Design a protein with these regions (language model features):
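Phosphate- and divalent-cation-binding pockets in alpha/beta enzyme and binding domains
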Residues: 60-61, 128, 223, 250, ...
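A structural signal for short hydrophobic beta-strand segments in well-ordered beta-sheet cores
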Residues: 23, 167-170, 264
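A conserved hydrophobic position in a structured secondary element of the catalytic/binding core
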Residues: 53, 215-216, 275
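A C-terminal functional module that forms or caps the active site or interfaces directly
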Residues: 225-260
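Conserved N-terminal catalytic core of the sugar/cofactor nucleotidyltransferase
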Residues: 1-11, 28-118, 125-126, 130, ...
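Hydrophobic helical membrane-anchoring modules
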Residues: 257-261, 269-302
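Short, surface-exposed amphipathic charged segments that create phosphate/polyanion-binding patches used
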Residues: 87-98, 161-166, 278-282
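Conserved core of the sugar-phosphate nucleotidyltransferase
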Residues: 127-214, 218
Length: 302
């Protein structure tokens, strides 16, 4: 059976809280969101996990998360170093911000050599999402065929402020494009987005969005590197300290030049995350409810 890897983008994990040890648990047993993702991934069939982290957080990450997971997974680490860039590109003076999700994933080249799924560390995706992506990858032999788990926008927003989501265009179950909207606000059963804080545009609650749960072949890592230089050269002309190389940028380019296709795997799960401190109570309530329903045991892994 082919090895299918779970890649977790965790370089920014804990930054809002002053460190990993300051992340508040979401249940009385002390679990944080990534614990549930790892548990769901294990149940789906994943046995290899790669954590993308900052080099300086490795010891704390191993202590808080990595060492515990070595009982269940083969664990590897990838560093998202600011200066790991294509030849000819240099870090602008004063730049401290990471280069974005596309760069994070590109750093896995040489470590991930087969099919893999990728997730954010601080999003709660739900059990079925991992089963769907694992089953797709297990059955797929064409390296140009990717997948994305698609959520309904109404299941991924918060009452407490804006969220960033990849708004998807879909035809016959296949992704035709994804647009990053960085300021989406809940509005009743629907939502609206703004680019400038003044003009707002409606989005239907049933709109399918990406939560960065993708299934790829290792070929995408070559694509990410091949396209990064041109993107950053152009982006740094106008925004050298803050521009980001987002993963959907490369997916869109591959869709446009027909070097890849992306099947959308619909998911009716509700997303949970602590985008805002006020979100914590609803996440805790949801976890308690799922435990009461038997979806999770009180103590994971027992």
């Amino acid at each position: 059976m082919r090895k299918i890897t779970l890649v977790i983008m965790a370089a920014g994990m804990g930054s809002r809280f002053g460190g990993l040890k300051q992340i508040e648990p979401i249940d009385p047993e002390g679990h944080i969101i990534i614990d549930f993702s790892l548990f769901d991934a294990w149940r789906a069939g994943f046995r290899d996990v790669v954590f993308i982290i900052k080099r300086e957080m490795e010891a704390e990450f191993q202590e808080c998360i990595g060492d515990r997971m070595e009982r269940y997974f083969h664990v590897s680490y990838v560093y998202q170093d600011l200066d790991r860039l294509p030849e000819g590109i240099e870090v602008p003076e004063g730049r401290t911000k990471p280069w974005g999700t596309g760069h994070a994933l590109a750093c896995c080249k040489g470590v991930v050599n087969g099919p893999f799924a990728v997730i954010n560390a601080d999003d709660f995706y739900g059990r079925t999402a991992f089963s769907e992506i694992y089953d797709f990858l297990a059955a797929q032999t064409d390296e140009s065929k990717y997948a994305m788990v698609g959520y309904r926008l109404k299941n991924t927003v918060t009452e407490f402020g804006s969220v960033a989501r990849g708004v998807c265009e879909i035809e016959d179950g296949m992704l035709t494009g994804v647009t990053e909207r960085t300021k989406i606000f809940k509005k009743g059963a629907d939502a609206e987005y703004t680019e400038d804080g003044e003009h707002f545009f409606p989005l239907a609650g049933d709109t399918i969005v990406s939560m960065n749960l993708w299934g790829f072949s290792a070929r995408v890592l070559d694509e990410l590197w091949a396209r990064m230089g041109a993107f950053l050269t152009e982006a740094m002309k106008t925004n050298p300290l803050k521009c980001e190389y987002f993963l959907p940028f490369v997916v869109n380019e591959q869709l446009a030049d027909k070097s890849a296709s992306v099947q959308v795997l619909p998911c009716e799960e509700t997303w949970y995350g602590v985008t805002y401190r006020e979100d914590l109570a609803s996440v805790k309530e949801a976890v308690a409810r799922m435990k009461a329903e038997g979806i999770y045991t009180e103590e994971l892994w027992k």
